[in-house]
Amino acid sequence: MPLDVVVVMDPITGIKIAKDTTFALLLEAQRRSHRLHYVHPGSLSLNEGRTFAQTAPLQVRDNKTDWYTLGEFSETQLGQGQIILMRKDPPVNAEFIYDTQLLSIAQAAGAQVINHPQGLRDLNEKIAAQLFPQCCPPTLISRDMRALKMFVQKQEQAILKPLDGMGGHSIFRSSNGDPNLNVILETLTDGGRTLAIAQRYLQQIIEGDKRILLIDGVPIDHCLARIPQGDEFRGNMAAGGRGESRPLNERDRWIAAQVGPEMRRRGMRFVGIDVIGDYLTEINVTSPTCLRELDAQCGLNIAGQLFDAIETGG
């Protein structure tokens, strides 16, 4: 039976469809004859306890020069019988949080929201990994520049990054004796006012930062290793990393088995976990990517697997 699939995303005008996971989800929903509705960015509202949005009928095509057609926008109540894909990219700022609160009200009115709005509020993608310390490298999250500096000195090499970044932005590699360490810490913590994360530098990054996708807590059998290029230490695709599919190894599956049940319990139906070597570094719940690359390299239809789960009610 056709469903109404409502997508909350960044402007569709600016996406790169060859790599855009949200676009792959829309293609699959349309292939299944579901009705697509595009939410005008920033248009969620609350009126007398009901969530509304400006939405337009959407058609998509796998054509890099002409990939969508929008109908006329109109005010639509969000609720009963709808599938709402919350696919806005970080940062998870106040406006993002407010949108999830409005989506929680739509969920209470009968919508199925993916991922669960409460989980999106609760699970910062850097901090969430620390729910599973047995899987993680040595990590410190702090505003205290002195403590962060001592951590780098103890580990000898460390990665330093903000808690709200994505795509490799504002990530630093530093080491004991680095003359730039103080200014890096001043920048990341805004002079001690903002939390930042420090993790032991993992040499295995040269083999790739593995993105493992979970659907209802169960891993896809292949991951995408994002391999840094040249003298770059970041594997992120947005930072120029090269993506190479690989079958999951035993340690990957063990980490997924630690993380998956808790993600499912929290309603995080589509999740990306990042693994470097033997260690979990992040849990991506807002808008996990790498689906299109894995589909292309492995002959998969990951969006189809997700919609199979959605259509059964989960």
UniProtKB/Swiss-Prot annotation:
Q: How is the cofactor bound?
A: Binds 1 Mg(2+) or Mn(2+) ion per subunit.
One GO MF term attached to the UniProt entry? glutathione synthase activity
Q: Which cofactor does it need?
A: Mg(2+); Mn(2+)
- Ligand binding (ATP): 151-208
Its UniProt pathway annotation is:
Sulfur metabolism; glutathione biosynthesis; glutathione from L-cysteine and L-glutamate: step 2/2
Ranges of residues in domain ATP-grasp? 125-311
Its GO CC terms?
cytoplasm
**What reaction(s) does this enzyme catalyze?**
gamma-L-glutamyl-L-cysteine + glycine + ATP = glutathione + ADP + phosphate + H(+)
* Residues involved in Mg(2+) binding: 282, 284
Task: Determine the domain of life of the protein's source.
Answer: Bacteria
Any idea which UniProt keywords this protein has?
ATP-binding, Glutathione biosynthesis, Ligase, Magnesium, Manganese, Metal-binding, Nucleotide-binding
Enzyme class of the recorded protein, top EC level = ligase
InterPro entries xref list: ATP-grasp (IPR011761), ATP_grasp_subdomain_1 (IPR013815), Glut_synth_pro (IPR006284), GSHS_ATP-bd (IPR004218), GSHS_N (IPR004215), PreATP-grasp_dom_sf (IPR016185)
The answer to whether keyword Protein biosynthesis applies is no
Query: EC number(s) of the enzyme?
Result: 6.3.2.3
> Which HAMAP family does the UniProt entry name for this protein?
GSH_S
Instruction: Tell me which family the UniProt entry assigns to this protein.
Output: Belongs to the prokaryotic GSH synthase family.
UniProt cross-references to NCBIfam families, sorted A to Z: glut_syn (TIGR01380), PRK05246.1 (NF003573)
- Write down what this protein is called: Glutathione synthetase
The organism encoding this protein is Xylella fastidiosa (strain Temecula1 / ATCC 700964)
